[in-house]
C-alpha cells in the first residue's frame, strides 16, 4: 500500500439544509469551513437536493444541488440519497469522496415522506494490486422517536451483518439521534464496531444544539481500522453555522 493511503479521514455533518439554528442561510460559509479541513470523506445529513421555492427566494442559493456545491472544489465523487420528498423538492443524505465509488445502495428507513431516514451504503477501494482494500462507508440518519429508532437500529445491524464482511474495514457516521446512548453497546458487543470519540475520550461527543451542545446524537463508528484522532468541531465558525456540530476523525489501516 502506498504511504499516502495508510490513513483515511472523515467528517460527519448534519447541515440542516444549509440553515443555522436561527434560520439564516449559511451554506457558503459551511462549504468554506469544510474546505479548510480537507478530509477524504464528508458524510452529510439533511442536505437539500432541490427546493424550488427557496432557490427563487434566497439570493445565495446555489445553482447546483447542495452536495454538488460543497463537493466541487475537492471531492470529485459524490452520492446522494433522496429520502424526503415533497412538493417543492427533496432532501436526504450524501457522501462526498476523494476516491471513486465501486458500488452503492440506499436503504430508506423513513416512515414519513418528509422525514429523511436512511442508510447510504457505499464501497471504495484503497491501494493497488495485491494491497487493494475494500472499504465500506455508511452514512446514517435515524429517527427522533424511540420506537422508530429501535426498528431502524435493528435494520442497520442486520444490514451490516449481511452486507459487510468482517475482514473488510467499515466507517459509519451520521446523525443517529441516540441521545440516550443505547446503540454503541450492541454495536460493539454483537458486531465489533466501536465509536471513534468514545474510543479516544471515554465518552461520546456532545454535538447538538451547536450553540450550546448538550446531546450526543452524532457519531463516527469504525471496524477493522485504528482511530488516531477524533474531534468535535466547536467554537467559531461551527457553532454559528448548522444546528449540529460536525465530528472529525482519522483512521489508520491495521
For each of these PLM feature ranges, what is it?
Residues 45-58:
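Active-site neighborhood of divalent metal-dependent phosphoester/pyrophosphate hydrolases
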